[in-house]
């Protein structure tokens, strides 16, 4: 987090939720009670704002996938989804991104790519979904 960003947040009265999982569709929704409580993807920032949260951080989770991954493609896809949501939600959303220990070269390339995109939050790491 840059010093300028930190200074703008500290003392501003802003509340940051550091552990969210924004989503584009139901397959990426991670709520425990999705059958009873489901927000449309675009409602998330509004719902958080109503709770007093002005900035939310986190990665997109592929809840449709469970088990070992045969390639890095799906990891890259959810990282791309986080970039898309950053465009949609603007400064209210700080995206996080995934890496995968079975794909070290690809993960290092992804760290470099996301850094070029201005994304510096690595996580959440999800061995329980990505099979490691």
Predicted regions located by residue number:
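Active-site gating/metal-coordination segments in enzymes
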Residues: 72-132
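An N-terminally biased module of ancient metal coordination in phosphate/nucleic-acid-related enzymes
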Residues: 1-77, 112
């Amino acid at each position: 987090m840059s010093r300028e960003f930190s200074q703008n947040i500290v003392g501003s009265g802003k509340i940051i939720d550091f552990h969210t999982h924004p989503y584009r569709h139901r397959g990426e929704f991670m709520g425990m009670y999705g059958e009873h409580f489901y927000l449309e993807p675009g409602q998330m920032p509004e719902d958080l704002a109503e709770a007093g949260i002005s900035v939310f951080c986190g990665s997109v989770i592929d809840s449709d996938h469970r088990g070992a991954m045969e390639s890095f493609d799906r990891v890259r896809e959810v990282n791309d989804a986080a970039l898309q949501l950053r465009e949609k939600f603007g400064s209210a959303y700080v995206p996080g991104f995934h890496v995968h220990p079975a794909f070290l070269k690809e993960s290092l390339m992804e760290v470099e790519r996301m850094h070029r995109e201005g994304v510096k939050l690595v996580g959440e790491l999800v061995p329980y979904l990505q099979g490691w």
